[in-house]
Amino acid sequence: MHEKFTFTLKSTSGGARLGEVAMPRGVIRTPAFMPVGTVGTVKAMYLDQVRELGADIILGNTYHLMLRPGPERVARLGGLHELIRWPHPILTDSGGFQVMSLSGLRKLDEKGVTFKSHVDGSLHHMSPERSIEIQGMLDSDIQMQLDECIALPAERKEIERAMEMSLRWAERCRVAFGEQPGKAMFGIVQGGDQPDLRIRSAEGLKELDLKGYAVGGLAVGEPQDVMLGMLDITLPVLPTEKPRYLMGVGTPDDILKSVARGIDMFDCVMPTRSGRHGLAFTRRGRVNIRNARHAEDMRPLDEQSNCPASRDYSRAYLHHLTRSNEALGGMLLSWHNLAYYQELMQGIRTSIEEGRFADFYAETIEMWARGDIDPV
């Protein structure tokens, strides 16, 4: 067992990095995809399944867990790991993004943000210190600073104000977090689509000497080339010996291109959310299983996959389930999508280790471009 939180950069291939984050509850192989367990569940999945697919860590959402069942109750029940039966690492976000996007009647100032719950309209206050306190009660292994995430496009003045506020909040979160052996607090780079603000944010966070650094405020409405451009500007500023986490991203294409730039960790609801709506991600691109072409196709989504949902169930059956709005359809497609994401990450890690990431990148893009197999 690892007593401390450590990050080891094991190998590189071009800009892509192979590493390992170690902590008492386990080791995270990077680049890593973290399935999102918003309210203590990866939607439509058993956590045993999530683990079997290759996930080393999952994500929990501070905003949702704060509203129900509540952090004090989670703490009384032994913490989030005990409650949900997941003994491996958990990362919790700060709740900031959901406060800004879901809650009503927000009042934001230097102290924090006051907001109404989207569940029952109750009034709550989230400060940097309270966010860290809640994450401590949840007993997560990696905790995120409270930040203000601005949706793009936005005026530069507003982006700059939010970035500077987030920097000050990062320092307060660092003080509130203190020293917790075996755990880590990450800062979040903000600055919207403004290169100089991104650099200022990264430099300011670097001075705090945190255990890891996230890039936030992307995949919030901007084109992919803008997101990648911000990574090109931001990542050279961040220390190479610390893990880098791109928040809320994304599609397999986003992940592959971000790995090429040096990102180590990802999370996104896309594989499970898309699965619940009949969309499958495969080695030959996206497949909308609701389309009529699949109605009498007895072939599986991917006969090469180790996942039963991908290998053993016909497209015709998956089509029937999704068109009938049966819960099993969303369950099987979520299972398939998470399997594909983890297979992609394993392929990325192996290719970096073998020094052939550029070839893997080109081969993967080429396979996606071919499109789905021909109809029957």
UniProtKB/Swiss-Prot annotation:
Signal peptide: none
Top enzyme category: transferase
Keyword hit for Membrane: no
Chain spans, region RNA binding: 248-254, 272-276
Residues involved in substrate binding: 93-97, 147, 190, 217
Keywords in alphabetical order: Glycosyltransferase, Queuosine biosynthesis, Transferase, tRNA processing
Pathway membership, UniProt: tRNA modification; tRNA-queuosine biosynthesis
Catalytic activity: 7-aminomethyl-7-carbaguanine + guanosine(34) in tRNA = 7-aminomethyl-7-carbaguanosine(34) in tRNA + guanine
Enzyme Commission number: 2.4.2.29
UniProt GO MF annotations: tRNA-guanosine(34) queuine transglycosylase activity
Domain of life: Bacteria
tRNA processing keyword on record: yes
GO biological process, one term: tRNA-guanine transglycosylation
Cystine crosslinks: none
Active site per database record: 93 (proton acceptor), 267 (nucleophile)
Gene Ontology CC annotations of this record: cytosol
Subunit annotation: Homodimer. Within each dimer, one monomer is responsible for RNA recognition and catalysis, while the other monomer binds to the replacement base PreQ1.
Family the entry assigns: Belongs to the queuine tRNA-ribosyltransferase family.
Function: Catalyzes the base-exchange of a guanine (G) residue with the queuine precursor 7-aminomethyl-7-deazaguanine (PreQ1) at position 34 (anticodon wobble position) in tRNAs with GU(N) anticodons (tRNA-Asp, -Asn, -His and -Tyr). Catalysis occurs through a double-displacement mechanism. The nucleophile active site attacks the C1' of nucleotide 34 to detach the guanine base from the RNA, forming a covalent enzyme-RNA intermediate. The proton acceptor active site deprotonates the incoming PreQ1, allowing a nucleophilic attack on the C1' of the ribose to form the product.
Entries under HAMAP family matching the protein: Q_tRNA_Tgt
Descriptive protein name: Queuine tRNA-ribosyltransferase
Organism name: Agrobacterium fabrum (strain C58 / ATCC 33970) (Agrobacterium tumefaciens (strain C58))
Gene: tgt
